[in-house]
Regions:
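Conserved nucleotide-binding/hydrolysis micro-motifs of P-loop NTPases
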Residues: 16-19, 32-37, 114, 152-153, ...
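Conserved segment of the helicase C-terminal RecA-like domain
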Residues: 182-213
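Long, largely alpha-helical accessory region at the distal end of helicase-like NTP-driven motors
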Residues: 220-227
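Post-DEXD/H (motif II) to motif III coupling segment of the RecA-like Helicase ATP-binding lobe
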Residues: 1-29
Length: 227
């Protein structure tokens, strides 16, 4: 009677599953990057582009956000600032070096399809006709690097996937869980490493903290990245 009309909902969190030996252990490394101050960033305007820096662009959108006249305007500006930050080249440069340095089987979660194609010879996204072939090569172990956009289908299992790079955390615990879930399918005796790139002294740190709210702090390490 109780089970039928008053079902009990129980949330089984990731760290409990790790502790019980159902999922493999993990380590999350947050790489803190400084916004680039050099005038190499092209800021788009109605008249075209003009040279700016990542720091100036971030401050520009943050100031506009602080002076928003309505809740709707604030929402729009938050999205516009986030999209600008996702396009900053310094994070892409750092991610590419990290990606190429890793010798384990590794997946990179890019922000856009264009970025995924730039970051890796083999990419997986809806506009790439070779996506399924690339995924099969990756699953079968014929290649050890793959870039993708958002998350792969929940049913896709990739054997021996030991490391992952997340370009942007979104501040969304569910999206982060889906991405981290790709790396929690090893043998329970093994450990996966998740790299999250984050701009220091920006709203990006808040997004990362919110995304990882349900994860064990002792498994999370913040390091200063060297550009």
């Amino acid at each position: 009677m109780v089970a039928k009309y008053c079902p009990i909902k129980y949330r089984y969190i990731t760290d409990e599953a790790v502790e019980h030996g159902i999922l493999n252990d993990y380590e999350i490394i947050i790489h803190l990057l400084d916004l680039d101050k050099s005038l190499t960033y092209k800021q788009k305007t109605k008249k075209g582009y003009f040279p700016s820096s990542e720091l100036k662009n971030y401050n520009y959108w943050t100031e506009k956000l602080m002076n928003a006249g309505s809740f709707k305007e604030e929402q729009i500006l938050r999205v516009m600032r986030m999209k600008s930050m996702m396009g900053y080249p310094s994070k892409e440069r750092y991610a590419l070096r990290l990606f190429n340095k890793i010798t384990d089987k590794v997946i990179l979660f890019a922000n856009t399809q264009e970025q995924a194609d730039r970051m890796c010879t083999h990419s997986y996204h809806s506009s790439n006709k070779a996506s399924e072939d690339n995924l099969k090569l990756f699953k079968d172990g014929d290649i050890d690097k793959l870039s993708c956009v958002l998350q792969l289908n929940e049913g896709v299992n990739i054997p021996n996937l030991k490391q992952g790079i997340i370009m942007h955390a979104y501040g969304n615990e569910r999206k982060s869980a889906q991405r981290l879930g790709r790396l929690l399918r090893l043998n329970p005796t093994e450990k996966a490493i998740v790299h999250i790139l984050c701009y220091d002294n920006t709203v990006d740190t808040t997004w990362v903290q919110n995304a990882l709210e349900q994860y064990d702090d002792s498994k999370i390490k913040w390091i200063k990245a060297n550009e």
